[in-house]
């Protein structure tokens, strides 16, 4: 059995795993145990009342957090014509078609998000085996296949997160950095939960958002009392 680090022992001692914390208290607890070596991300796990085995109950989408994620995001765009200048003006880091596809085939993937206009999918479709496993394949459900590439680039740059439930019906994503204020993290979490509630499948029955837990990159999860949100 792996030996617990001094930090993990402190976290286990300081976090009551049976308690649901008021959101501001939960964030205070997280900040007590953050690393001094780097600024950790604040992540969230949301347990949904869905049957993930049923395709019509899976939840997938994207939303822009009001205070962003604290991360610098590099965006690659597949498009042509007038959209090229629009994408560049919006802040895209890489813009192209076949030339960009060739870079990716060579393993040159210095980007975090891929966006494509519909007329570029004939090129992007050839990259499915490369982009798919990395979670980078453009998809209209999360707004990364769109005729308005400029807006998609701006969203990605301004803190858009993409979410998708895992096989256990849990959404895992980030809501900011440990150096964000409690209010910023709370408002980001509220924005995510509002987006998830809006995306509730029609076939999902009962309580939809069942449990919300927040954690830092290397910390333990802290359950959040939803009534405090």
Curated annotation (Swiss-Prot):
InterPro entries: Ribosom_uL1_bac-type, Ribosomal_uL1, Ribosomal_uL1-like, Ribosomal_uL1/biogenesis, Ribosomal_uL1_3-a/b-sand, Ribosomal_uL1_CS. Transmembrane segments: none annotated. GO terms for cellular component: cytosolic large ribosomal subunit. The keyword Repressor applies. Belongs to the universal ribosomal protein uL1 family. Binds directly to 23S rRNA. The L1 stalk is quite mobile in the ribosome, and is involved in E site tRNA release. Protein L1 is also a translational repressor protein, it controls the translation of the L11 operon by binding to its mRNA. This is Large ribosomal subunit protein uL1. It comes from Histophilus somni (strain 2336). The lineage of its organism: Bacteria, Pseudomonadati, Pseudomonadota, Gammaproteobacteria, Pasteurellales.
């Amino acid at each position: 059995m792996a030996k617990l680090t001094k930090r993990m022992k402190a976290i286990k001692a300081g976090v009551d795993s049976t308690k649901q914390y008021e959101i501001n208290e939960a964030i205070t607890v997280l900040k007590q145990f953050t690393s001094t070596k780097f600024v950790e991300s604040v992540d969230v796990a949301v347990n949904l009342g869905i049957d993930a085995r049923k395709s019509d109950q899976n939840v997938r989408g994207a939303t822009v957090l009001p205070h962003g994620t604290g991360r610098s995001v590099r965006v690659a765009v597949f498009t042509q014509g007038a959209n090229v200048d629009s994408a560049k003006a919006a802040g895209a880091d890489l813009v192209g078609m076949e030339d960009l596809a060739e870079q990716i085939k060579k393993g040159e993937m210095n980007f975090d998000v891929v966006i494509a206009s519909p007329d570029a999918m004939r090129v992007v479709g050839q990259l499915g085996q490369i982009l798919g496993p990395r979670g980078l394949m453009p998809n209209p459900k999360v707004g990364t296949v769109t005729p308005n590439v400029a807006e998609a680039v701006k969203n990605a740059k301004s803190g858009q997160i993409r979410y998708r439930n895992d096989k256990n019906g849990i959404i895992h994503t980030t809501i900011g950095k440990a150096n964000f204020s409690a209010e910023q993290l709370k408002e980001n979490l509220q924005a995510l939960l509002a987006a998830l509630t809006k995306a509730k499948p029609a076939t999902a029955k009962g309580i939809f958002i069942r449990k919300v837990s927040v954690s830092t990159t290397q910390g333990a999860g802290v359950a959040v009392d939803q009534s405090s949100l």
